[in-house]
Design a protein with these regions (language model features):
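Short loop/turn motifs that connect adjacent beta-strands in outer-membrane beta-barrel proteins
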Residues: 21-29, 63-75, 109-115, 151-157, ...
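Short glycine/proline- and aromatic-enriched beta-strand/turn motifs that initiate or cap beta-hairpins
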Residues: 21-63, 180-196
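Predominantly the C-terminal beta-signal and adjacent terminal strand-loop region
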Residues: 23-28, 147-196
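Residues that define the transmembrane beta-barrel architecture of outer-membrane proteins
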Residues: 28-30, 48-54, 93-100, 114, ...
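Transmembrane beta-strands of outer-membrane beta-barrel proteins
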Residues: 30-34, 73-81, 116-122, 142, ...
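Residues on the lipid-exposed face of transmembrane beta-strands in outer-membrane beta-barrel proteins
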Residues: 34-38, 54-60, 102-108, 120-124, ...
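Extracellular loop and loop/strand-boundary signature of outer-membrane beta-barrel proteins
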Residues: 42-44, 89-91, 128-134, 169-175
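Gram-negative (and chloroplast) outer-membrane scaffold detector with strong preference
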Residues: 52-128
């Protein structure tokens, strides 16, 4: 089932690379991206857990480029819909969905096709069984990522390395949480903003 889901997600990513005009991140512009990622637990009682998730993002590039030297870039606010979130636990497999209403992203300004970024995000996750096992089926997610967009003629590919923490924030006891390191890939488009 996992391989089938991963194959379908990958095929959808490839099929979405249609002829939409590609631009760089611009102030007043927007980003739309379809992404998928996964990783493994890093420590503690949940170190043997693994995750796979896939979703879509819509973002608003809120600023013109500013900042000194290599830190110069544009600030973006985005939201993620996460219809696929799977947690592979030793006892069972959890299927869920989530929503990240807060994604804060800094797109560094470059003259090349490579646009590095850093990101902080937070959201909520609902699963069919408790995550971690014996805790809660409602959890909160926080993540930090470093990655890059690779700008093509029609689409922008992205890849990032992400640290994600999943926790019930005290809704249930115990609250061991799951800490994962993930790799995420995506395909998306930057749309020009409307200027008056």
């Amino acid at each position: 089932m996992t391989r089938l889901l991963a194959s379908i997600t990958f095929a959808a990513l490839l099929c979405c690379s249609t002829a939409i005009a590609q631009t760089r991140p611009q102030d007043g512009g927007h980003e739309f991206e379809i992404w998928a990622g996964g990783g493994h637990g890093t420590n503690g009682s949940t170190a043997s857990d693994s995750v796979f998730n896939a979703g879509a993002r819509f973002g608003w590039i809120l600023t013109k480029a500013h900042g000194p030297g290599f830190l110069r870039g544009k600030f973006e606010y985005a939201v993620d819909a996460v219809p696929v979130f799977m947690v592979f636990q030793p006892v069972n497999r959890a299927y869920g969905a989530g929503f990240n209403p807060v994604v804060l992203k800094w797109n560094f300004e470059t003259d090349s096709r490579i646009v590095p970024f850093v990101e902080l995000a937070g959201g909520v996750l609902f699963t069919n069984v408790t995550v971690p096992t014996g805790t809660s089926d409602t959890n909160f997610t926080t993540s930090a990522a470093i990655g890059m967009h690779i700008l093509g003629e029609k689409v922008a590919w992205s890849v990032d390395l992400r640290y994600m923490h999943v926790s019930n924030a005290g809704l249930a006891t115990p609250n061991p949480g799951i800490n994962t390191v993930q790799v995420r890939v995506g395909v998306g488009w930057f749309f020009r903003g409307h200027h008056k």
